[in-house]
Amino acid sequence: PSPEMKDKVSKYSVLENDYDWSIWKLKMPFDSTPYVMETQFQFNPKAKVFINYRRPVLFCSSPEWIRREKEHINNTQLWSIALLHELYHQYQYSNDAILTYVLRLYDEKKWLDMDSLQVYYLKDNLFKDSIKVENDLLEKAVAATSLDEEKKIYTQFLKVRANRQKDFLKKYKYTLVNIENFWEKLEGTSLMMEKILKENFTKVAPPPYIVEHDEMYAKNFAFNEKEKSEIQFYSELDDKRFYIGTTGYNLVQLLEKNKVAYKENLYKYASLPLDLQLKYFYKIK
């Protein structure tokens, strides 16, 4: 936390750790939400007293609290994956270009969070149907066995997406292009990081103290990313998960499949979309 945040917090204690981190434990909860695992902003000028005013702050409930609210997160390993997903968002926002772009989108009244995007997905049937077609095309492109086939499928994806975004603009008098591109980049790469972390989780030795004293640490627990359900979790749409994360993840899969050097400019050029980098790669006019 930055030094100026201290004036906005009534009481806190500093948690000791083995890393060069400054971790605060608030004496009182920041809000009344029993479960939180999210990087949050406040933009409203009336919220200047909050520590996350125009600044991304990760709010995280303890494993014990989360187990009460989310039955599927029932051990330390699962909790840590959720935490590291959000910590990766913190890393993304630590890049000046990304944070500056977020603030600019808000100031220009072009900002929507992922929850707001998901509302359109859940409530607008035509919007949702198009997203399903788009994601199916992305999955087919990932599975394609030739570059020519892949290019044809991806070209169709771009057409379907462009038509949906045009229809949205006509209907709601608001463009989604920039904000969808932004969230696909951030959430798609976070999900890819999460999946890779699960695949390599056993290579990271847990601290002996955790193994000995943490009652929620599951000693025989292991992730199996080859299970069909795990593969589907990332690549297939589910109303309970952000659609933008799924399409973003599949775009990242295509970039990785073709060894596109997208990581070099991933956060340096905040407004550069994943789908455009693939369009350049396929040389689609």
Region spans (language model):
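Extreme N-terminal leader/anchor segments
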Residues: 1-18, 82-88
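Post-HExxH zinc-binding segment in Zn-dependent metallohydrolases
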Residues: 43, 94-172, 180-206, 217-222
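Mature extracytoplasmic/lumenal regions of exported proteins
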Residues: 76-79, 91, 105
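Pan-zinc metallopeptidase signature
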Residues: 159-285
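Aromatic-lined carbohydrate-binding surfaces of glycoside hydrolases
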Residues: 73-77, 99-102
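Active-site recognition of the HExxH zinc-binding catalytic motif
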Residues: 81-94, 191
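Charged, glycine/proline-rich intrinsically disordered loops and linkers
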Residues: 9-19, 26-30, 122, 131, ...
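Active-site scaffold of zinc-dependent metalloenzymes
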Residues: 10-76
